[in-house]
């Protein structure tokens, strides 16, 4: 909910996809402190989380949101198609990319006994991978794209080698969960 600049309190709603719940709970505390110092206002942040596509549909159908942080460009496009975001928003970003980033984190066993440091390590025969399915999870598509970008840089854009890299990576997948939250508990 918007407030005028003279108000000492402001409330915003962030509609986001499910795995970001804990991230934004922590980030909001940092933002609240920053906003108080910058604008002199106390900010209350309401979080709404669910599947990215469902959240996009909710916003397109009238759920009030000051900020949307969704998993996929197609979900943002659904909001654009409802007239809530300007056409051509992707042109503002390098390579017409999505206006959102995601950090990929490798969770390893305590002490990292297999010394996994980057994507190439996930291709070793002694490594098993647990990841969500990119056909069903927005976060998994970020994983896929991050692996592709790593291989693209490693192989100087040679698509044959990049595809072989991705194929080998997915051959090492032990659990291909339907969603990011499930993959973190597998």
Q: How would you describe each model-predicted region?
A:
Residues 154-186:
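Ligand-binding pocket segment of bilobal, Venus flytrap-like solute-binding proteins
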Residues 2-82, 92-93:
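Early extracytoplasmic/lumenal segment of secretory-pathway proteins
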Residues 27, 31-39, 63, 72, ...:
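Sec/Tat-exported extracytoplasmic proteins
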Residues 10-14, 58, 129-137, 170-175:
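Second-shell loop/turn segments in exported
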Residues 1-4, 113-115:
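Short N-terminal or domain-adjacent regulatory/targeting segments
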Residues 40-45, 72-77, 95-99, 133-136, ...:
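Short, surface-exposed, polar/charged, turn-prone segments marking secondary-structure boundaries
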Residues 21-28, 32, 52-56, 60, ...:
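Extracytoplasmic/secreted envelope proteins and their assembly/folding machinery
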Residues 80-153:
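A conserved helix-loop-strand patch within extracytoplasmic ligand-binding domains
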